[in-house]
Amino acid sequence: MKNIGIAINPSKDYKNTILNMVKEKIENICNVTDIEVYNSFDIKNLNLSSLDLLIVLGGDGTLLGVARELEDDFKAPILGINIGNLGVLSSIEISDLELALKKLMTKDCKVHKRMMLNCEVDINESIKNIKALNEVAVARGTLSRMVKFKIFVDEKLYAIFKGDGLIVSTPTGSTAYSFSAGGPFICPDLEVISIVPICDHTKSMHPIVLKGDSTIKIIAENGGDQIYLTIDGQRAIEMKDNSVITVKKNPKSLKLLLFNDYDYFKVIRNKVLNNSKECDGEEI
């Protein structure tokens, strides 16, 4: 790999410490000297077509933001290096950087495609299309009443229920908000979409996993109270009553570079379920 870029969150205080260490190790191990550093907030406005690899330095939030802002024709894989708190989406921890770069040079790694969502919504009488890597959530405001939801799958009515909200999730996002609301873990290499209710008061809506090419239409009614559309837990948009939100698979996937010893179930145990100690030493 000749051209490697690094995306950083400019609001984090590591620009002169961890960043310099990462650049030095890349230069020494990968024999790459011209390393571009990018502001993760400006990714959408940059020409990254020459990159062979984009390293995202930060936590899950930084990687989610970069994934949404990348243009659909971006072809290079992403290597997430976790220096945040959780790092479920990251390929490696910062402490494993040197070993990871050596594996990169010996091609002991593989590109995994992660499905993304496209959310179409009417904002101020203008149709907007927004990408999501984890999930699209529609929920009531802080002091609002319950929301009445109508959910259609491929133009067929699936459910009508009243509750606090609902989550439409990718397999990658199944370990995030969807999991907190009672949704299942879904292996991230699959291409399916899950719908999970949030505090379903009527108990008439059950979580469902749909095929990846399904089109989901959501109508949210709240009698004039606040309704919010939230993308990956980072972008919030206040919706009008009776808003229609359409969610489907994005045509382009995110390419994540993972090493061959990557263990999805270990990530779940250690970073989501926090029961790594109970599983230590257990073998088949």
Curated annotation (Swiss-Prot):
InterPro entries: ATP-NAD_kinase_N, ATP-NAD_kinase_PpnK-typ_C, NAD/diacylglycerol_kinase_sf, NADK. NAD(+) binds at D60, G61, N134, E135, R145, K162, D164, T175, A176, Y177, S178, F179, S180, Q234. The keyword Hydrolase does not apply. Involved in the regulation of the intracellular balance of NAD and NADP, and is a key enzyme in the biosynthesis of NADP. Catalyzes specifically the phosphorylation on 2'-hydroxyl of the adenosine moiety of NAD to yield NADP. This is NAD kinase. Belongs to the NAD kinase family. It comes from Clostridium botulinum (strain Alaska E43 / Type E3). It comes from the Bacteria. Transmembrane segments: none annotated. Its EC number is 2.7.1.23. GO terms for biological process: NAD metabolic process; NADP biosynthetic process. Keywords: ATP-binding, Cytoplasm, Kinase, NAD, NADP, Nucleotide-binding, Transferase. GO terms for cellular component: cytoplasm. The keyword Kinase applies. It is found in: Cytoplasm. The active site is at D60. Its cofactor is a divalent metal cation. It catalyses: NAD(+) + ATP = ADP + NADP(+) + H(+). GO terms for molecular function: ATP binding; metal ion binding; NAD binding; NAD+ kinase activity. The gene is nadK.
